[in-house]
From Swiss-Prot:
One of its GO terms (molecular function) is aminomethyltransferase activity. The lineage of its organism: Bacteria, Thermotogati, Thermotogota, Thermotogae, Thermotogales. The keyword GTP-binding does not apply. The gene is gcvT. Keywords: Aminotransferase, Transferase. Belongs to the GcvT family. PANTHER family: AMINOMETHYLTRANSFERASE, AMINOMETHYLTRANSFERASE, MITOCHONDRIAL. The keyword Disulfide bond does not apply. The glycine cleavage system is composed of four proteins: P, T, L and H. GO terms for cellular component: cytosol; glycine cleavage complex. It holds the Pfam family GCV_T_C. This is Aminomethyltransferase. GO terms for biological process: glycine decarboxylation via glycine cleavage system. Its EC number is 2.1.2.10.
Amino acid sequence: MKRTPLFEKHVELGAKMVDFAGWEMPLYYTSIFEEVMAVRKSVGMFDVSHMGEFLVKGPEAVSFIDFLITNDFSSLPDGKAIYSVMCNENGGIIDDLVVYKVSPDEALMVVNAANIEKDFNWIKSHSKNFDVEVSNISDTTALIAFQGPKAQETLQELVEDGLEEIAYYSFRKSIVAGVETLVSRTGYTGEDGFELMLEAKNAPKVWDALMNLLRKIDGRPAGLGARDVCRLEATYLLYGQDMDENTNPFEVGLSWVVKLNKDFVGKEALLKAKEKVERKLVALELSGKRIARKGYEVLKNGERVGEITSGNFSPTLGKSIALALVSKSVKIGDQLGVVFPGGKLVEALVVKKPFYRGSVRREV
């Protein structure tokens, strides 16, 4: 299994390590519950160095990215980032990602760990007609997420630039604990926070400095377990569960990242798909504390209407919550049933998204 540059730090902290997409990653350090609560009330710090980073350079970098992703990259100012998906020719989602516009001839793409090789090969295959150079810098890049309502005031102690000046989905290159770092106001938890991108060799030094800050504010390191709970509470999607190449953006509530007034891979298929959307992703609150798993059937009046894509117990809400891909006829307020192993039917209420709205700054 692969290991991030912070592997030894996780072992020192007594983390429960698990295999995630071929990476040996911390599932939790003390408990998922405590780590979720730290993110919600103070700060949680995540090692997300397993994510993939690609550097795109060249005079046609912006037009190339614009051709790859569904969102509008060309009108983005330097120093801003954008969330998007990449689709195949059939409109299926290859991956969701964040792209940073560094300059008119340089962009940085951050993709999901499980898709690094697939994404890089797909991107390279489309680069031949553009004056660009695409590099996979994943192995030499570390990524640390510092998330929670106290993230700005806490992190500011170590950062030379004023964090208040970094707006949501904006970034700048700065010095953090003496190390050159790209600091972005982005995250996957529903809280305010920052993601720190730096050279892998410098990651342990920065991690240690951040750990010293966390101890002062009752913050804590957080593993993939807490990350998954936080993202589900905030109703952020997970690739491979809530979406994949068999779903299109309109089915999973991502129509807002599809800009049909420009050209991109999969546009023709999405123009057609938009006219006949038969499924949608809905939020469910389940009765009891049992966790609905991916693939569990969802029934309405005894008839199958879809299936669970993600489920977990929410410590923040004290409820079992889930996302389900269901027939478009399902609406908020509907009472559904989720079929658990053994045929047990658990009641589920369709609720408004998101389940939880935290301190995240929504102005982009």
